[in-house]
Structure formats: C-alpha cells, structure tokens
Amino acid sequence: MMGRNDDAFHPLLHSTPESSVKIPVPLVSVGRESSQSKGNMKTAILIWLTLQNSIHTLLIRYSRAREVDAMFVSTVAVWLTEVIKCFICLFLVAQEETPRRFIHALRTQILEQPYDTLKVCIPAMIYIVQNNLFYVAASHLDAATFMITSQLKIFTAAIFTVIILRRSLNRTQWFALAVLFVGVSLVQLQGTKAKESSGESPFVGFVAVVVACCLSGFAGIYFEKILKGSAPVSLWMRNVQMAVFSIPASFSAIYMQDSKTVNEYGLLYGFDSIVWLTVLWYGVGGLSVAVCIKYADNIAKNFATSVAIILSTIGSIFLFDFIPSFTFLLGASLVIFSIFLYSSHQSMVAALGRLRGEIPSTKEAFCL
C-alpha cells in the first residue's frame, strides 16, 4: 500500500476518511470521455469522407451535364482549385507557427531548398493533367459509372507499388485486383451500350478515366517515395511546394487549350453558383487525404467509398434518369467487394506494425 507522501502525487486517487481504499473514479471518467471523443471523431470523419466522395462525383457530373447557355472552361476550374488548395494549406501552416516563423518556414523549405522543392514537380504536373482528365470523363460518363471506374486507381497504384517500390502483393491482393478489373469491365458494359447523346461518348470518358487512374497511381507512389526519402516536411508544406508548380502549370494549360474562349469571354465565363461550389468542393476534397492520414483507418475509408458508390448511383437515378442494369449492379458489387478484400491484408499488417511499435507506411496512410 502507498504511504501518505506517495498519495500526494496521485490526485486522481480519491481516499475516503473511513477507508484507505482508493477509487480511481475520475480516471474512469476521463477514459470514457477520451474514448467517446475518439469515437465521435471517427464517426464525423466517416460521414465527411462519404459525403465528400459522393457529392464531389455528383457535382462534377452535374456541372458538366446540365443544359446551360454558357459552359464553363474546365481548365480554369482546375487552376482555381489549385489556388484554393494553396491558400488553405498556407492558412493551416500559419496556424502551426507564429507569423515570423511562418515566413521563415516558407523561405527555408521552398526558396532555400530548391532541390527538395523540385522533387514534387513531377507529381504536381501529373495531378494537373489528371484533374483535367477527370473533367473530361465527367462530361461523358454518368456519375455512378465515373465513380466506380475511378476505383481503377487502386489497381494502378498496386502495380506501381510493385514496380517502383519493389513491394510484393500476396495472392489475396492479386485476386482482389482481378475482381476489381472484372467489376469495372461489367460496369463499363452499360456505358458502351448507352446511347451517345448531346455529344457524349462513353468510350472517350472511359479512356479519360483509365489514363487519369494510371497517372494517379504513379503520382501517388512517386509522392510516397519522396516523403520517405526526404527530410521531414509537413503534409501542408508539401502541398504548398506542389502549388509552386501546379498553379503556373494549370494557368498555362488554360491558354494552351482554351485561349480562344478565355480571350473572348474572360476566365470566369460560364461560372455560376454550381460551378463555384464544384471548384470549392474539389479544392477542399483534394486535401481530404490529410484527414485520412490523421484519423481514418482502412476500414472507415473503404466503408466511405462503398457507401459513396451507392449514394452516387442513387443520385444518378434521381438527377440524371440513370437506370442501372443487372450487369452494372453486379459490377458495382464486385468493385465494393474487391476494395474490402484488397485492404484486408493491409489492415492486418498495419495492426501488427502498431503492436510492434512500428510507423505505418505512407501507402497505408494515403487514401489511394
């Protein structure tokens, strides 16, 4: 039993006058509050990821498929998205530092380390091309097909993981990738049978998604290699470094692709509340990876993706008169199944790593 002096150093232990029994009531209360707080946070993140994935898909499709007098220029939307992301990241970096240290951090980590900043040039450029391709895909595919087909990024990320990072996949993961490929193919069958109307081409949309997913897979794995092989820099600062290249590159793409329209009507031609909402949602959603890293595990991420696929399908039915066929529903089910199957091995490895006190890899942390 502890002596009187020892008790003085344990304020959480309550001793009654009648007995020397210590009752750690406050400790239990604190533990319950902490557990409840974590549970509430995970629930909030789960809801956010689900809404972000589904609403983003429906918004980008609706902004491109609706009938309007003036259609906005997608390259301008991509550029504004990069600007918004940069300002958000600068704000978050500034919140972590005093104004003086904030300016010092920008100078030392961007200007005084040009080689380190130059490393993110490749993924920054790739993400610009990828985002432009996603707008092309959204112009030719319904929201549900677009959402499901874009899950090919899991397949491409896995392939580049084997090629670039020299990691091996087990049989379960290879089987999951095969199921994913079959599921996407079945979903695309409905798209190829659909009538091409209003200048839409499901084949063009599918090719755009496939190329975008290949670029996304390569950029994600390349970015992981940068993070693991470079000096420690916060994720927000890395995004600021990428903005150094992505903002001028995306602005150049405007005049390379849509100079005639922009020169005649201006940058904000066709922009209305729906377009601005799409751009803002795209910008905030692009930073959701940081939320995944800090709070969400693979199970939460995959559940959010699966529910988002279902919500996107339901939204497409009501907003775009989309009628899913049996092959579409079968393909969607296979895609959802493959997502959980592929990550089940990763979740197990991550759990073992935590038990051993290891740091999870960026591949586990990033929402690929």
From Swiss-Prot:
Its main location: Golgi. Changing residue 285 to E: In e2680; resistant to infection by M.nematophilum and prevents biofilm formation by Y.pseudotuberculosis. One of its GO terms (cellular component) is Golgi membrane. The keyword Membrane applies. The chain crosses the membrane at residues 72-92, 118-138, 145-165, 174-194, 203-223, 235-254, 273-293, 317-337. Pfam families: Nuc_sug_transp. It is found in: Golgi apparatus membrane. It is a multi-pass membrane protein. Disruption phenotype: Worms display altered surface antigenicity which prevents bacterial adherence. This is due to a deficiency in both O- and N-linked glycans. GO terms for molecular function: UDP-galactose transmembrane transporter activity; UDP-N-acetylglucosamine transmembrane transporter activity. InterPro entries: Nuc_sug_transpt. Expressed exclusively in pharyngeal cells g1 and g2, lateral seam cells, spermatheca and vas deferens. Keywords: Golgi apparatus, Membrane, Sugar transport, Transmembrane, Transmembrane helix, Transport. GO terms for biological process: UDP-galactose transmembrane transport; UDP-N-acetylglucosamine transmembrane transport. Belongs to the nucleotide-sugar transporter family. SLC35A subfamily. NCBIfam families: nst. Acts as a transporter of both UDP-galactose and UDP-N-acetylglucosamine into the Golgi lumen. Apparently transports UDP-galactose and UDP-N-acetylglucosamine simultaneously, and independently, by an unknown mechanism. Functions redundantly with nucleotide sugar transporter nstp-4. May be involved in gonadal development. PANTHER family: NUCLEOTIDE-SUGAR TRANSMEMBRANE TRANSPORTER. This is UDP-galactose/UDP-N-acetylglucosamine transporter srf-3. It comes from Caenorhabditis elegans.
